[in-house]
Amino acid sequence: MSESGHSQPGLYGIERRRRWKEPGSSGPQNLSGPGGRERDYIAPWERERRDGSEDPSTNVMQKTPIILSKPPAERSKQPPPSTAPAAPPAPAPLEKPIVLMKPREEGKGPVAGTGASTPEGTAPPPPTAPAPPKGEKEGQRPTQPVYQIQNRGMGTAAPTAMDPVVGQAKLLPPERMKHSIKLVDDQMNWCDSAIEYLLDQTDVLVVGVLGLQGTGKSMVMSLLSANTPEEDQRAYVFRAQSAEMKERGGNQTSGIDFFITQERIVFLDTQPILSPSILDHLINNDRKLPPEYNLPHTYVEMQSLQIAAFLFTVCHVVIVVQDWFTDLSLYRFLQTAEMVKPSTPSPSHESSSSAGSDEGTEYYPHLVFLQNKARREDFCPRKLRQMHLMIDQLMAHSHLRYKGTLSMLQCNVFPGLPPDFLDAEVNLFLVPFMDSEAENENPPRAGPGSSPLFSLLPGYRGHPSFQSLVSKLRSQVMSMARPQLSHTILTEKNWFHYAARIWDGVKKSSALAEYSRLLA
């Protein structure tokens, strides 16, 4: 109470009324006079609040949020990022620590280890709920590089059952060919079946053969590649000319046949050049000629030139087989094929226009002259010198490598001759008749019923045996240098595609087209 007898304003406020209204008896607590209780009851405390609520407890709850709203404001002042966009950086520090890298290393074990890795990340309790899905995603990421490392290092270590099979298949040797297949068919079309036997490796030697009809090209290529003289000729990889075919005067090989050995040596057997049987087949069977050729003999010669020019471009070694010495038309044909051969200049010399620079970058294979079915007098030193001298004079203007890479003197075929016996030694090799070995099975006898003469010594033949000569020829051919065919190093498969482009270019060659017009 004040000195004037009135109550102070702060004594009968809301807090004061809360004290006497909570017990529930308002009569004895009315100390302000007869109208004081009504004044206190009608006082505009609730009207000023404009809430319409008569419960005092609600007023207290309305103030408490105001009081509680201050601590969040104070809390927001302490951390600088208090706004909602600050939430994304929160998981970022969770990814920065290396705690997530530990389950990656442990993820190499069983899958149960991934579940055990989640309690390790309990340091930040709020992201415990999203941590498992992140752990699963992060656990899947390291499994991929680990899988790749295992494949690179181990080769056969892989979780699936097919990977060991693939790894073992890569370690297995390539499939061995049992017979030759077509590289160019009888219609002079390219065949793609040979690429299945090729690999991606660069150590490959390509050997081709040229020769007239009936000289024994297929037999020589079979003996050099996979067969021996003791085997049946019907089992040769390159089918030789049968007796019936010889009687008819026909040719056995048509187009170009392909065979590759386990030593990665490619052998290309070809149809006979300038073949009369092919010409007879064109004339008698009324076979339609291509529109650019008018006469059958022109078409036969152009086919032969296309095959020879193709071999001069894609082969390391070209063997020219003859069965007698010698045919001058064969050397004219070789010079013509060299003239129309596709050029293979280096890219750095493509812009050069001088002929000398082009000759320096041109590719030419090794040329080997094989004298098949040689007689005894052919192995005479005097006759041997004449043969070398004649070939050297006929090929004097050729850029083909016809000398310096094969020698019969160095392989001890003529043990009594000195190395400098031949003034101009060319790549010439002599092989006798294969059937001559059968003559030694019946040694000469003095009489019909007498014992054989010189039974302990072999009969005189004037040359080594057929098997030994073929073996020496094979060793010399396989040991020849392998010059680079193009300006880039070619693998087996790259060589196949390169040969396909060369064959297509040979068929469309402008030089061959011009030469065919001159023949017509």
UniProtKB/Swiss-Prot annotation:
GO terms for molecular function: identical protein binding. Keywords: Acetylation, Nonsense-mediated mRNA decay, Phosphoprotein. Phosphorylated by SMG1. The keyword Nuclease does not apply. It comes from the Eukaryota. Residues 78-94, 122-133 have a biased composition (Pro residues). The modification Phosphoserine is found at S2, S4, S7, S32, S53, S451. Residues 36-53 have a biased composition (Basic and acidic residues). Residues 1-143 are annotated as: Disordered. One of its GO terms (biological process) is in utero embryonic development. Disruption phenotype: Embryonic lethal. Homozygous null embryos show a range of abnormalities, including edema, hemorrhage, exencephaly, preaxial polydactyly, decreased size of the mid- and hindbrains, microphthalmia, thin myocardium, and cardiac septal defects. These phenotypes are variable among mutant embryos; there is evidence of incomplete penetrance, but most embryos show clear phenotypic abnormalities. Involved in nonsense-mediated decay (NMD) of mRNAs containing premature stop codons. Is recruited by release factors to stalled ribosomes together with SMG1 and SMG8 (forming the SMG1C protein kinase complex) and, in the SMG1C complex, is required for the efficient association between SMG1 and SMG8. Plays a role in brain, heart, and eye development. Self-associates to form homodimers and forms heterodimers with SMG8; these assembly forms may represent SMG1C intermediate forms. Component of the SMG1C complex composed of SMG1, SMG8 and SMG9. Interacts with DHX34; the interaction is RNA-independent. Belongs to the SMG9 family. This is Nonsense-mediated mRNA decay factor SMG9.
